[in-house]
Amino acid sequence: MIYPITVFGDPLLRQTAKPIDKDYPELAKLVDDMFETMYFSDGVGLAAPQIGLSIRIFVIDATTYADEEPELADFKKAFINPEIIERIGDEWTMNEGCLSLPEIREDVVRPETVRIKYMDENFVEHIETYGGFAARVIQHEYDHLDGIMFIDLLNPLRRRLLKGKLTAITKGKVPTKYRQKLPGKK
């Protein structure tokens, strides 16, 4: 099932998501649906709040970037109840976008490496360290679980310059190939 993408302005995107347990109803289907929604929307990652669920899970498939970073060749994962243990290394800037902020791309500064603890879709715990593009996408999706969007990491002047675009998003005036769930709409 392809979910509509919850876009900027919906209060759910600003909530801290709740952990889930291994008995979460139809977890395998949810993970599959999240990947399907992400692929349909041309995303690299997708967090549950972006499909209207305030739970601590995100999915990433960075395999299409394996030409630039060979270690991404098999990087397709679900992260359940993740916890970033450590952010390390030099900060670096990269242009980011977000399905919940269509047509907005901005340079965002993030640490180059993260150490993360999470459960996979079988509720097996992992503690792993990622760098480069994988670390960036993990941090971006993880932020969604804490109600943070990449525009929050921009300087105040840059954010002010985006006000018109953000207003257009909340009103559904930014066309996308995917269905959008607008603020205040069911």
Locations of the language-model features?
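Active-site rim/adjacent substrate-binding subdomains
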Residues: 1-139, 144-186
